[in-house]
Amino acid sequence: MAVLFIMCPVSSFARDDDEDIYELSLDENLATPEIKNDKQADRIQEFQYDMAIAFKKSNYAVEVMRDDEVIVITIPASQLFDPNDTVVNSVGEALLKPFLRMLKNPGFYKMLLVMHSDNTGSSVYTLNLTRQRVNAIYDWFDENGSVDYVVPYALGDTDPVVDENNNIVENNSVENRKRNRRLEIFLVPEKTMLQQAKKGTINMSHIAKDK
């Protein structure tokens, strides 16, 4: 069985049904919607674990968090963009394409796009670079599918990788800086998945397959 790295849980946050997800912080969006029913949570955890394994078998770097309810896929920025560029390249497009089917059933997933940089350059530069890059990825999803329930975040160099030993990966080598330049895609269960889990079965057929 493939082993997935477990990330630390996020703080609890209660979201109103009419809350605008685009007005929420990253932590707030990661914490909601909250799943309070144990049986419902069990079904979602099982479904998400299977999805995570499928991504891992396709050679994506995968983690799970929030009691296995949220999937995190990390893609190196070097596989999405040419150096210092803000246009998604052909390799990046191929890596992003599998996520289009996650968006074909609005409300099944909330997808959070979180772009990071190393600390090369000023904080203003790194923030602007990550903002342009995450907006380019958001626009790519908009042009090729849908951006309903897709929320972009640009964090500059403020959130370096934390490794499996809970150590911060410092920007003190070429390899470490490369690790910190990354896109994190969080797949958070949303209302449609929660409704299916409440009824008893989460059915992948509700997400249309690519032709």
Kindly label every feature range from the protein language model.
Residues 34-41, 79-89, 123-127:
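Second-shell loop/turn segments in exported
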Residues 39-42, 46, 50, 91-98, ...:
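Extracytoplasmic/secreted proteins, especially bacterial periplasmic and envelope-associated proteins
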Residues 1-70, 190-196, 200-211:
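N-terminal targeting leaders that direct proteins to extracytoplasmic destinations
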Residues 63, 70-76, 80, 110-114, ...:
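Soluble periplasmic/extracytoplasmic beta-strand elements of cell-envelope proteins
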Residues 117-203, 207-210:
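Periplasmic OmpA-like peptidoglycan-binding domain that tethers envelope proteins to the cell wall
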Residues 50-59, 63-65, 81-114, 185:
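Periplasmic peptidoglycan-binding/anchoring modules of Gram-negative envelope and division proteins
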Residues 67-69, 76-78, 86, 101, ...:
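Solvent-exposed coil/turn segments that connect beta secondary-structure elements
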Residues 23-26, 32-37, 71-74, 110-114, ...:
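A broad, low-specificity signal for short, low-complexity segments enriched in glycine/proline
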